[in-house]
Amino acid sequence: MTKEVITGSEALMRALRDEGVKTIFGYPGGAIMPVFDALYGYTGGENKTFNHILVRHEQAAAHAAEGFARVSGRVGVCLVTSGPGATNTLTGVADAMMDSTPIVVIAGQVGIGALGSDAFQEVDLVGVAQPICKWAYQIRRPEDIAWAVSRAFYIAKSGRPGPVVLDLPKNTQTDTCEWQPAKTTNVRSYDPYPTLDTQAIEAAAQLINGAKRPFALVGQGVELGNAHEELLAFLEKADIPAGRTLLGLSALASHHPLNMGMLGMHGSYATNMKTQECDVLIAIGMRFSDRVTGTPETYAKQAKVIHLDIDASEFDKNIKTDVAVLGDCKQSLPAITALLQPAEHKEWIASFKDYAEQERLRVIEKDIHPTDGPLLMGEVTHVVSEATRGEAVLVNDVGQNQMISSRYFTFKQKRSIVTSGGFGTMGFGLPAAIGACFGVPHRTVCCFMGDGGIQMSIQEFGTIMEQQVPVKMILLNNTFLGNVRQWQDLMFGHRHSFTDMLNPNYADIARGYGIPYDVVTDRKDLKMKVEKMLSTPGPYLLECAIKPDEDIVPMTLPGKSVDEMLLELHY
């Protein structure tokens, strides 16, 4: 039977369809126009397959794809042109690589005959992208498109997830080929799901069974592996208290009795202090980043360290491991749990409460229940979290707004935190929230931003307007680049070198885009205006006038051990 002859652009549409893609974030341009022409036939009428979201900047397309992937568990897709269109996505690609987020970036390229000639909007995208993604590939023949797309999705979502970049020369889009679907089930020299080592499983279980003061560190690997139930079974059988990384905050429900709080530089006092008192430390799907460990030379030296991860390169990279368990935590956790003896650690768990009470009295009550002065970020977060009853998705930008909203937001459901953890990308929040709204349209998405971060992606108000994206935006406006200002106060003698912000009139900007807006300047109006925001259909911008010199505590200073965490900052 004669096979159907189609263009490369049509082949791309079919390959994406076969991967189950429904949503694409993109921006057209010269070198990708044939693909967008093919896309036109798949976005309307009886043949509608894709929902294309026209962003206002290609970096936003990548971040939106990240947000979509984080909350949905599916691969996010963005489609852009060559040259600046492609390079604009690279911050998002690097961000996705750092945070193990599965996205596929498809970029146009000049024709093969023009490669290397410095043609208009030409860039060696594969060469630039290779160090910051799992796989970068230039598709030089239309008959390779189905294979390359299938391989890209397999690599992006398997093992430790991450970004893939496909470079598509213009003639590959217009040349024809016989259509042949493809399905990738393995890639040579790539082993995304290693077989569990029985000896490592037994060694880990033996250490845990002998532990008097075990402590688990729960990372995003639990979310990526969909191992939430396996985690609960593990923790509850052995009665192990747990701290959560920034990216792992919704891997364990906030109010679970074994949840002791957030890890890290601005995490919970108890989780940081008790890291230095445990006798067995169990790291689950986390990478011991510098923001968690403080000074690595002093980190948990008294403890035996068990590290569960799907990526062998993380073992002994930052912290010396006594037992390394390589594999997907959805398999490794139940394998260990089966060998555990039921245990109780009541006194050990109670000792966390002592530190938690100190933090509550000296930090939390002041943050969320202030009685006078300007609004604080903590009280705004607390009111929004209470109003959404822990059911919302939290998306935040980078800086003080990120730390405070992550500290005080409550999580009941999995895949509920979307943040730029490893790369710390300002401007991430707004486009990521747009992507999250399309990833889980049935859930409320709350996006916390500072006045610095919002202005790095404020053009995406256009996307929100056009698509009527129902994102609830909370702008914490302290008229400063607050996190940098705090460090300037701590380390540079209060010399505020270019960190004070002259802000535009956000009411006028919101009005120009047709987005409902309100502002809170008095805390007596806060709850009412938050409830109004949440009850208003569609998008909403709520600006909160925040105390300009508010600091984020607790804080572990750079170069300090985690048990040197401060509950107050003294200048």
Predicted region positions:
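N-terminal alpha/beta PP-like core and its mobile active-site loop of ThDP/TPP-dependent enzymes
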Residues: 2-347, 383, 387-390, 470-473, ...
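Conserved short loop/turn motifs at secondary-structure junctions
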Residues: 219-224, 369, 450-452
